[in-house]
Design a protein with these regions (language model features):
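Short acidic/histidine- and often glycine-rich active-site loop of Leloir-type glycosyltransferases
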Residues: 302-313, 317-318
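N-terminal subdomain of nucleotide-sugar transferases
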Residues: 1-58
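Acidic donor-binding loop of glycosyltransferase active sites
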Residues: 86-89, 157, 266-283, 294-297
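A charged, aromatic-enriched C-terminal amphipathic alpha-helix characteristic of glycosyltransferases
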Residues: 334-354
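Conserved catalytic-core segment of nucleotide-activated headgroup transferases in glycan assembly
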Residues: 17-35, 44-45, 154-160, 164, ...
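Acceptor-binding helix/loop patch of EC 2.4 sugar-transfer enzymes
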Residues: 111-112, 116-144, 168, 206
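Short hydrophobic beta-strand element within catalytic cores of glycosyltransferases
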Residues: 287-291, 297-301, 317
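Conserved acidic donor-binding segment of nucleotide-sugar-dependent glycosyltransferases
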Residues: 316-323, 331-336
Length: 354
């Protein structure tokens, strides 16, 4: 069968720069494309933004994927609607892209199956952001995206979700619907650097994603001063691409504003504790899964740990206030038996699940 993958982003956008490390761990196009190709399907990929600049598109082509790009194609939606008859199935991603295109695609090719990949529930993430800010405009945006996202789910032949949590949430909202669960796709990593060989604390994120910006501000302004007061002596590493300019103002003797890291596996394998203080979001968190994969224990908010089938105190530590975070970070950083237990159990858990 010939499949058309339609996704937000650019034909040249590397996953390194997308989220600060070498792949968008949960649902990277190459991972999905590779699985589809191994099943014998011919895959074409249409990014929302068409300019070609190299690395990412070439990586897809090495997997046998046809990449549609400029200058041969100037408008992604026009190409899709005009050439849809050449394909047996459409795979659309994200409410902001796939959700917008899906109604026209369904009207033009009503007989063709469409799979809608939420990536995360966008409206849920925006609703949680609105609850944090209390801004009427944020609530209105969340409601607009909710209508688009739920309409796409209703019209799709099947919806792809990342977690049982979001499946249950949607079922409560709209009742039963055709769906499939595809969680994180993580490469195995059996090696684990020991406690003594590691130092410091790190946050990893891509800063085109607003929850990560908010998390860093919360970490630096509210959590880190309390950890300083405990005289832990660790340094905070803020990692990831597309940082706001004012992040440089956070640089201090005990705060290293790193930016983009090419080889995150090596970097995180030298870090003693990973922190995920997300105050809002949805889906499953690649930063949590990737850290645990490397044997780097995590302190996370309930939102950051949500939907990942991880247990507080067994696979990671969960904290929900600045004081809880400071205490959990101090405890995990200094308590070697606890660190070793969570490092081993967390790595084993994600190896089993993802």
């Amino acid at each position: 069968r010939k499949l058309l993958l339609i996704k937000t982003g650019h034909a040249d956008r590397t996953t390194n720069k997308r989220l600060g490390y070498w792949r968008k761990a949960p649902r990277l196009d190459p991972a999905i494309a590779r699985l589809l190709s191994e099943l014998g399907h011919r895959v074409s990929f249409v990014p929302e933004h068409l300019p070609w600049q190299g690395t990412y598109a070439r990586n897809l082509q090495r997997l046998g994927v046809e990449v549609i790009h400029a200058p041969s194609v100037q408008n992604a939606q026009s190409f899709i609607l005009e050439n849809g008859s050449d394909y047996d199935l459409f795979f659309l991603s994200r409410a902001t892209t796939g959700g917008r295109i899906l109604p026209a695609l369904k009207a033009t090719y009503p007989e063709k199956p469409i799979v809608f990949d939420t990536v995360d529930l966008h409206f849920l993430r925006l609703l949680r952001a609105a609850e944090l800010t209390g801004d009427t405009k944020d609530f209105q945006e969340a409601e607009t995206v909710k209508r688009t996202e739920l309409a796409a789910i209703h019209q799709a032949s099947a919806t792809m979700l990342v977690s049982e949590h979001e499946r249950a949430y949607l079922t409560d909202e709209i009742g039963p619907f055709p769906h499939v669960l595809l969680p994180l796709i993580l490469a195995p990593h059996t090696d684990r650097t020991g406690y003594e060989e590691r130092l410091d604390i790190a946050f990893v994120g891509g800063y085109r994603h607003p929850p990560n910006i908010d998390a860093v501000r919360y970490l630096v302004q509210d959590i880190w001063p309390q950890l300083r007061a405990l005289k832990l002596g660790a340094r905070l590493h803020i990692i990831g691409s597309h940082m706001p300019a004012d992040f440089q103002d956070y640089a201090a003797e005990d705060i290293h504003v790193v930016g983009f890291v090419q080889d995150l596996d090596t970097y995180l394998s030298s870090i003693r504790v990973s922190v995920a203080p997300l105050r809002y979001g949805a889906g499953v968190k690649g930063k949590v899964g990737n850290s645990l994969r490397l044997g780097t224990p995590v302190v996370a908010t309930p939102v950051a740990a949500e939907g990942m089938s991880l247990t507080d105190g067994e696979h990671l530590l969960v904290a929900n206030s600045p004081s809880q975070f400071a205490q959990a970070l101090y405890r995990l950083y200094t308590d070697r038996p606890l660190w070793e237990r969570l490092s081993s159990a967390g790595q084993s858990r994600v190896e089993t699940l993802y």
